[in-house]
Design a protein with these regions (language model features):
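Short loop/turn and capping residues at structural boundaries
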Residues: 22, 48, 87, 123-126
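Short, charge-rich binding segments
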Residues: 65-66, 87-89
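Short, flexible active-site-proximal loops enriched in glycine and acidic residues
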Residues: 74-75, 97
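Class I SAM-dependent methyltransferase "Motif I" SAM/SAH-binding loop
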Residues: 76-80
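S-adenosylmethionine
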Residues: 83, 90-202
Length: 202
């Protein structure tokens, strides 16, 4: 089984169907994360040998949650996790990669161009300055839940959702003020992943 075939099978176990082109681009993204994101300090060197599970698959599991959305934003996108991964998996979804740090925003521009992610756009600025509103906001390794919600609520349309990636060791928190938790999703096939906490305005 080739590398891309293996990724397609792993994605299938998460309920995500990838065609060969999508799998190939995600495999190339793994290489870019190793070659560019680790030296930049966006991805930990300790993740070098587990980028697929720790980052690609962990991000990919959010795709089925947002299949019905038209416009999403990845807050503090960093290296494009989960934004680039979800944008590749869901080409109909328009993705805004929000990153205020210039070097990381430049990395995102390179990734989007090299992988041909035409439905993703980089916004080099603060969350409060980004265009909106959006249907979905992602927060992965961005901020504690209450802080992530405080920033996300201002860019979500009525009925919009925050998809928050809780750490593997994190106890599921109570909803921040003004929010309600719609669902808490766990992924048993990814042992190192925490829960996805889905929230909206109360």
């Amino acid at each position: 089984m080739s590398d891309t075939e293996g990724l397609r099978a792993q994605a299938g176990s998460l309920g995500v169907v990838l065609d060969p082109s999508q799998a190939s681009r995600l495999t190339r993204f793994e290489e870019l994360l190793a070659d560019r994101a680790i030296p930049l300090g966006v991805v930990s060197p300790s993740d070098a040998n587990r980028i697929r599970e720790r980052h690609i698959l962990d991000s990919l599991r959010a795709a089925p949650v947002v299949e019905d959305a038209d416009l999403a934003a990845d807050l503090g996108s960093g290296a494009g996790l989960p934004g680039v991964v979800v944008a590749i998996a869901l080409p109909r979804l328009r993705m805004l990669l929000v990153e205020r740090r210039p070097r990381r925003a430049a990395l995102l521009e390179l990734v989007v161009e090299e992988l041909g992610v035409s439905n993703a756009t980089v916004f080099a600025g603060r969350v409060a300055e980004m265009p909106g509103p959006v249907d979905v906001a992602f927060a992965r390794a961005f901020a504690p839940l209450d802080q992530a919600w405080a920033q996300a609520r201002g860019v979500l349309r009525p009925g919009g959702r925050l998809v928050y990636f809780a750490g593997a060791a994190t106890t599921i928190p109570t909803a921040p003020e003004g929010a309600v938790i719609l669902d808490v999703l766990r992924t048993p096939v990814l042992e190192s992943s925490g829960a996805l906490v889905i929230m909206t305005r109360q």
